[in-house]
Amino acid sequence: MPVCVMMAELDEKLLLQFETQELEAPGGIATPQVYSQLLVLYLLHNDMNNARYLWKRIPQAIKTANPEMAAIWAVGQRIWQRDFPGIYSAIAAYQWSESILPVMEALRESTRRRAYGLVAQAYTSISAEDFAAFVGYSVEEAVKGVVSHGWQADPNTRMIMPQKPDPPPVSLVPNEQQLARLTDYVAFLEN
C-alpha cells in the first residue's frame, strides 16, 4: 500500500478520534490540545467549513490562552483567502509544538501540490518569481522543482511553462443506459 494512502487513512482515523473526543468532552468543552489537533487536521484536509465552525465553537478563554491555536487559525485564514504566499509565511512564522509540527509540514507540502496543480491548469506560462511565491520556494528551488516535474523553464525570459495535466478519463455510458436515462427525463417532464 502506498505511503500517501496509509497516511491519508491515518489522518482520517485521527480526525475521527479528535472529533469523538470533542463530542464526549466533559461539560462540552474539550482540551486545547484536542481543539488544536482537530483544527490543524481540518486545515490539512482543506475542510474549511468545519475549521471555521470549530473556531467559532472554541471558547474565547481557550483561544486567548493558547497562542499556538491563534497561529493555526492565522494559517487557516490564509487558506480561506487563497493567499498561497501568506500560507507559507504563516506556517514559517511560528515555532510549532511537537504534536502540530508534522501536520503543519504535511499541510505545507499539500498546499504546494495544490499550487502546482492549479498553475498547471490555469497557466501556459508564468514568471519564475510569481511561481516561486505561489509554491513557497526561492526562485532557484522553484525552477529545479518544475524541471523535475517535466515542465520547461526559460532562463532568458525567466518564464516557466507548465505541462498541462492529462484530462480525466471520460466514463462512457452505454447507449442503452443513456437511452433509459433520457427516457426517464422526458417522462418526468411530461408528467
From Swiss-Prot:
Domain PCI: 6-179
Family note: Belongs to the CSN8 family.
Keywords: Cytoplasm, Nucleus, Signalosome
GO CC, alphabetical: COP9 signalosome; cytoplasm
Source taxon at top rank: Eukaryota
Compartment(s) where it occurs, according to its Swiss-Prot or TrEMBL record: Cytoplasm; Nucleus
Functional note: Component of the COP9 signalosome complex (CSN), a complex involved in various cellular and developmental processes. The CSN complex is an essential regulator of the ubiquitin (Ubl) conjugation pathway by mediating the deneddylation of the cullin subunits of E3 ligase complexes, leading to modify the Ubl ligase activity.
Record text on subunit structure and interactions: Component of the CSN complex, probably composed of cops1, cops2, cops3, cops4, cops5, cops6, cops7, cops8 and cops9.
Any one GO biological process: COP9 signalosome assembly
Origin species: Danio rerio (Zebrafish)
Keyword Zinc-finger recorded: no
Gene3D superfamilies, per the entry: 1.25.40.990
Main location: cytoplasm
Gene designation: cops8
Protein name per the record: COP9 signalosome complex subunit 8
